[in-house]
Amino acid sequence: MKRIIYAILALAAMAACAGPQVGVITEPVSASTNIQGREYPKINPDLSVEFRVNAPEAEAVAVDICSKVYPMTKNEEGVWVVTTDPQEPGFHYYFLVIDGVRLSDPSSQLFFGCSVMASAIDIPEAGCDFYLPKKKVDRGEVRMQRYWSDIEQNWRVCYVYVPAEYESKPDKRYPVLYLQHGGGEDETGWVRQGKTDVIMDNLLAKRKAEPMLVVMEFGQSGGDFGKILLNETIPMIDSRYRTVADNRHRAMAGLSMGGGQSWSIGLKHPEVFSNIGIFSSGMFGGVSYAPFDLAKEAPELLADPQAFNDNLDVFYISCGETDPRITHTQAAVEAMRAAGAEIHFSAFPGGHEWQPWRKSLHEFVQMLFK
């Protein structure tokens, strides 16, 4: 039965990028990630990008997009110019390199990624509008929640998405998704880069997802993060918000490092979480980690597949089609399925970056709390 539900919801989710040709560029447009009023960078109809940098005294200037470097040429006005190759749709970090020094672009908004505040450009994808704001959709809120951690002996901040109906239905209680960022990012990532609130608002407007809270927490706390999440974050959220405080109404998901945490914390605590999403995790292989060992990582599955499946309402794994992790992830999924696990697996166009993660979230939340 679970497999049938997975298949139906997956087909519905695929429709998100199969509609009218929204996102098609017919003339150069300023990037949505530019600081307001800045003309450049500009995205061209072929998805190449024109960058301009005013640095008349510099000796050499280049743009570094995800480690691909584009040397720039200085024009007569002292402005450095380059047009890149066509870019893949989605969100990409970039840096300027001026006389060998890597800097952020003063024309771009800044986003925390690569463990620094980085410039970025968001390339539209033709036909994909599930993460774009729409005028006639009720808007939820993203609330900054500050709280004290006895474990860290420090103040922490998490962000909480609250659906638009929350204040108008004071007697209603809500399930909760705990959504984790990747390495080199922080609790702002799923809001600013991932567009979680927009994705949720659009799905709720179409009645394709259940109203829920989404908690986005800082996960780079070393070995203490699991303790903080289980013993401090979740009790704090349950005390301050109207939640349904049981495992069937609680989910955990994350990208890359956050996907590994969803396994090591979420999957290992079925009394807390009955819904797990793992997006592009390196724990299955494809990066520098040791090969995935099913007997070591999931002995409970091998011991009792039926109990393993009964503990989970949704077990979801995804990866980008050109992510180095894809082959190893698919092999791990097949090994777990052979052992009896019921898993939904999806692969999306793209590498280890935000467009596949946005699509993963969009698909995953439609499966939750049904």
Residue ranges of predicted features:
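General helical structural elements
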Residues: 6-7, 56
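Bacterial signal peptide processing site
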Residues: 18-19
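Non-catalytic cap/lid and distal C-terminal segments of serine-dependent acyl enzymes
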Residues: 25-32, 43-70, 74-370
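Positively charged n-region of N-terminal signal peptides that target proteins for export
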Residues: 1-4
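Bacterial N-terminal signal peptides
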Residues: 7-15
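Short beta-strand segments of immunoglobulin-like
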Residues: 38-42
